[in-house]
Regions:
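Short N-terminal edge-element motif at the start of the domain
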Residues: 54-136
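Domain-length functional cores that host ligand/cofactor binding and catalytic or interaction surfaces
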Residues: 1-14, 117-119, 130-290
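Solvent-exposed N-terminal domain segments of exported/luminal and surface proteins
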Residues: 1-88, 240-290
Length: 290
């Protein structure tokens, strides 16, 4: 119900991905330049249904009251390098987070349990030793809506039926090849991920360019009166981004459900136990095809 707007990384920054070195513990090691090349290669194009300022991505900043806000005049996607176990090997994970100023109330509603200040979407790419995608997955920055998008290089494991929340795979995605980029189709307002597509580098040239920035900078945001502070509190949450849903979901054991939170604080299941940064998560769900 808005206008489709594409955001993309700078053109000409997705050259060949360097082979990583591996330390004695089997952990892939990258120089700063190698990590930057890997993030540039797999940075997604965002295709957002823009119906208001709340649908524009931007940089997290502090306002005059020291509250965290989004500056949509500076489109930024934040990055983090993580790791996971899969098929007996440690694989790099490229984590991209983009922020919106709010999730507005649903049109016509007087009470929307999910609405509130700030909203974020996290997109993660798990790659093999050659830097090629194995699995994509996504959550919102509160930890909700965990979706998996496997490529043809992995197969889902047969798991016993339990009451725990199971693997949710809305679609499979072909591994992006040279000259291709993943496109994330994002709904207006809710910022739900609706579809994952592929586009060529040439077709993404008309996108508004965003900048990639290390997510660790969010722990030292500049204050208007001088000095810095973290976007997150000591509890790992962003103050002011609470949701009314927390009063309904507290019996499920998730503290302040719906509130935006820091890496390491993303529980992704209300039934059972599942955390976004669990290093054994992918090995439990997938096998690598040989």
């Amino acid at each position: 119900h808005g206008r489709l707007q594409r955001y993309g990384p700078p053109q000409g920054v997705s050259g060949p991905v360097p082979a990583s070195n591996v330390d004695p513990l089997g952990v892939p090691v990258f120089s700063a330049a190698e990590a930057a090349a890997l993030f540039a290669r797999h940075a997604p194009v965002l295709e957002i249904d823009v119906a208001g300022e709340f649908d524009r991505i931007g940089a997290l900043k502090l306002d005059a009251e020291d509250q965290v806000i989004v500056d949509a005049a500076a489109p930024i996607v934040y990055t983090r390098l993580a790791y996971t176990l899969l098929g007996g090997l440690i694989h790099p994970q490229l984590v991209y987070t983009f922020w919106f100023s709010e999730r507005p109330r649903s049109p016509g509603s007087t009470l929307d349990l999910l609405a509130g200040r700030l909203d974020g979407v996290v997109w993660r790419v798990t790659v093999d030793a050659r830097g090629d995608p194995l699995v994509y997955d996504s959550i919102h920055a509160c930890g909700c809506y965990h979706l998996f998008f496997p490529t043809e290089k992995v197969v889902a494991r047969e798991l016993p039926v339990t009451l725990d929340e199971s693997l949710f795979v809305p679609q499979s995605v072909p591994a992006a090849r040279s000259g291709e980029r993943v496109v994330l189709r994002v709904e207006s307002g809710t910022h739900y991920l609706q579809r994952v597509l592929m586009t060529s580098e040439a077709q993404s040239a008309t996108a508004v360019v965003y900048r990639l920035e290390d997510e660790r900078t969010l722990t030292t945001l500049a204050r208007r009166g001088g000095g810095t502070r973290s976007a997150y509190g000591q509890d790992g949450f962003i103050a002011g981004s609470e949701r009314a849903e927390r009063w309904f979901y507290w019996p499920m054991g998730i503290e302040s459900a719906g509130q935006m939170r820091q890496w390491g604080h993303h529980a992704t299941a209300f039934v059972g136990r599942r955390h976004f940064d669990d290093p054994q998560l992918f090995d439990a769900y997938f096998e690598v095809r040989h």
